[in-house]
């Protein structure tokens, strides 16, 4: 007789993981990057982050209470705070407060709560908010303050980012290559950009913490970074006067932030290890294609959102093994 019992009877021992525990673990991993942004951007970083987090918490509470008629305890699980921090990390430090609030409203209201809240959203809410602001306010979203203006906010002096210089080189301005910071500067954070782009080292510290705590696995971030390195390396070998080295591609822009904190979102990424690898490779390829051949200097946000849409399809063809399933005898 076939044994149909594929899961053992109770009682079961709880593993200790919970949504709230993992969310606050991610927040701890974000602390190094936040401290670095404070060091380089000062008041602007504090205002942008505080406004984004407060707005996300408020809209999560208000929409849940008055529109969805759901319990408002979800504001305590940490997901809205993470959305606020990640949205802030995708914004320049001189962005006006009212634009930040609009981004938070779109991220929470459209990107998350309109689908039913945490666990139901098909797209990363923070990235949805960033792309909405980028398309709606392109001038404000591409004005990057120069690092070191600790007390300046909206009146901060702006300058070109490494990705903007790379794009100029692709368009034929060979002098732009000499203006791109070296790898050490990009690693430490001495360059302009969004709050979360300034230091690859701080983001790698966060990655190490999350891997240590087993909040995420290595499959998505490593597959993204390796794919970008290989693809960008091929392009650099083909035309080194036009395309920068793969190391500079890895350390510049929002690649590290996206690979570590955005693409690894539980809700919008595949469940199986095989699916994660496919997902990560596709994000890496799309990012390089958009960076080198697209209209925008940065392609990470668009690449992740595109692959978010393919996550259900990847899950369909890369189903994880069911717990307790017995392998078929050959």
Where in the sequence are the language-model features?
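Structural signature of hydrophobic alpha-helical transmembrane segments
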Residues: 43-55, 94-103, 186, 190-200, ...
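N-terminal signal-anchor module of multipass membrane proteins
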Residues: 1-57
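Membrane helical hairpin/interfacial module
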Residues: 35-87
